Amino acid sequence: MAGGGVWVFRNNGVMELEEQATSRKALVHVATSEVIRSTEALERRLGALGWERYYEDRATLQLHRRDGSADLISIPRDFSRFRSTHMYDVVVKNRDHFKVVDLHT
C-alpha cells in the first residue's frame, strides 16, 4: 500500500491517491528565531545553556549538562544526518529554548 495521502474521486469515476506535500523539519532557537543549520551552531547555543562535550567519535557528538544531571544529548557529527528524532531530543531537554517547525517544500 502507498504511504500517506488522500483518496480523491475524479469526475470520470477513477479514484486516485494524492500524496500529501512533504515537509522537512527544522530546529529553531526560540530567543533568536535562528534556524539551526550546523552542528557548530547547535553546540554554541547549547553551550550557552550549560551543555558541554561529553564524548565524541568520528560519527557522534554527545553533550551533557555541566550541572551534573543525567541528561545526555547525542547528535551526528555530520549535520546532514541530523533528523527530527535528534531535534525533539534537544527540545525535550531544553523546552523553553528550542522548537521544531515544518519547512514546507
UniProtKB/Swiss-Prot annotation:
GO BP of this protein: regulation of flower development
UniProt similarity note: Belongs to the FPF1 family.
PANTHER family assigned: FLOWERING-PROMOTING FACTOR 1-LIKE PROTEIN 1
Protein name: Flowering-promoting factor 1-like protein 5
